[in-house]
């Protein structure tokens, strides 16, 4: 029977529940167990697709086209199992489903209530992941912090599951903070005690307590936590701040967390084989070279807005035994000064995805700087579209060329709305989303990089290269080296008269892994190392 692990958080938010769940999943998978993982987000939005990156960070896109929380990116990178639309559930989705059932008459005229209707729907979403994947273990992260009113239905649902399927099949793991007070030079356990007390008041007794801390926890403090929280001493796990998130699986392995999990759930499995993972972490900690790459965007004040892009660059650095230093450049600042001033000295320039007119001219200037100064360039989604606009304006002589997203009256709308998008008015969940095939053109840079004729990549966009201008752009020297299988949609552009200039409509960052970097990022970082 499938076992279920529930990860909750207390004291403060952003403690690293997602990393904890991912790291545990990594260990269990490396012990030969099959693992599925999901996250519940308590907000009422259906998904984060229409939320500002300043509010939520990046939107991670799955193969099946779900727009999800950035923690799902951590899940895939650590566990290397694809997540799906069932892997991220919001309160909005739960209530949407329940209300639709009520309208259909599924509840036979009964009064619809949080208990049992909402809690049953939550449990159904957990069981659905188990039915879909048939794993040995399902790990479910509960977003938010214990004590938040929004999280109460989820906590009640997972409390009920202990009775529904038997306590031997359920494990509760609570992540909490042990703050350090500089004034007294002490670690304090009281916030954690109160967090566990709050959780127990709901009816959940944690089996494992994961303590986030800046400093190591003494044995006496672990004994104190075990006593006051009624948790076995061996199940008090310290998680000291690490230099790299990829050290976390090794740290909790040293604490014996995986053994404790298997003991509580009554499972047997061989020890985790972390040989390759250790080698990867060793490469992170012992780089032999360094490269600096500028990420030019408009959300750079919050790096989480470009989390997968930054991680993909670091993954490529791992492969090349290089430290990738990221220079975050606000594209709006380029508009007010000069690209040369803000980009001087970088070995590569990357323009990631985004939406809206703000900062666009700065991105275009950054791309021009990369093209004219032969600096390796990688554009992603909007980064490809702005690369086409820059080329049209400054090489092909199309004065004021633009995207119809930014200027509906542009004389040269080299980027235009996808035909199937023109009748769509709703914003949420209506873009071209998920994995699609890309046909590569022979004898191009990208065909040599991928070593394949057809690749499969994840997308999230409404706009495309306007086919009306393709011939003129190609005449100017731009190469459309990847298209949809029918040739209608441009997927990749490159500029042969440049050491390394590639841009993709898709998002390659979503398929990068720390031990298997994405080909485009791998070769981009390689080019930047040669350009130092």
From Swiss-Prot:
UniProt cross-references to InterPro entries, sorted A to Z: Class_I_gatase-like, CTP_synthase, CTP_synthase_N, GATASE, GATase1_CTP_Synthase, P-loop_NTPase
Residues the entry annotates as binding CTP: 13, 148-150, 188-193, 224
Positions of region (Amidoligase domain): 1-267
Known EC number: 6.3.4.2
Record: residues binding ATP: 14-19, 71
Keyword Magnesium: yes
Pathway(s) this gene product operates in, as recorded in its UniProt entry: Pyrimidine metabolism; CTP biosynthesis via de novo pathway; CTP from UDP: step 2/2
Pfam families according to UniProt: CTP_synth_N (PF06418), GATase (PF00117)
NCBIfam families with a match to the protein in the record: PRK05380.1 (NF003792), PyrG (TIGR00337)
Record family assignment: Belongs to the CTP synthase family.
Name of the protein: CTP synthase
Lineage: Bacteria, Bacillati, Bacillota, Clostridia, Eubacteriales
Gene: pyrG
